[in-house]
Curated annotation (Swiss-Prot):
Coiled coil: none
Gene3D superfamilies, A to Z: Glutaredoxin
Keyword Nucleus among UniProt keywords: no
Start and end residues of each Thioredoxin domain: 2-109
Task of the protein: Participates in various redox reactions through the reversible oxidation of its active center dithiol to a disulfide and catalyzes dithiol-disulfide exchange reactions.
Pfam families with a match to the protein in the record: Thioredoxin
Disulfide bond annotation, renumbered to this chain: 27-30
Signal sequence coordinates: none
Official protein name in the record: Thioredoxin
Keywords carried by this UniProt record: Disulfide bond, Electron transport, Redox-active center, Transport
Similarity section: Belongs to the thioredoxin family.
Source taxonomy: Bacteria, Bacillati, Mycoplasmatota, Mycoplasmoidales, Metamycoplasmataceae
Length: 109
């Protein structure tokens, strides 16, 4: 998973299928989700699906708990799946691996 500033991630997610995680190093749920997201990324890679995985630090982005932010990051971790610049899924906090994998696979059916 590539770590980016939001200003850079914003440009990269305009094309293709992208998984964006907003998290923070001090967040227990974020730490718990890290191996799950790594497993999701590996499974998607094994399926040869062209998906980019990005991590954005929620604190550094200046978007955490900001109601007027460009992207709603009201809880962390927040997971966005974006296709060609449009949000197709948002998940907050813990999500099981199989749900995230299925949400991504649906975009290629």
């Amino acid at each position: 998973m590539e770590t980016l500033l939001w200003k850079d991630a914003r440009e990269k997610i305009k094309k293709g299928v992208n998984f964006v995680e907003f998290a923070a190093p001090w967040c227990p749920d974020c730490v718990m989700m890290k191996p799950v997201i790594e497993q999701v990324e590996q499974e998607i890679k094994n399926l040869n699906l062209p998906v980019n995985f990005y991590h954005v630090n929620a604190d550094e982005s200046g978007m955490f708990r900001k109601a007027d932010a460009e992207v709603a990051v009201l809880r962390i971790p927040t997971h966005y799946i974006v296709k060609d610049g449009k949000q197709v899924f948002i998940g907050y906090e813990y999500f099981p691996k199989h749900i995230l994998v299925e949400k991504i696979k649906e975009l290629f059916k």
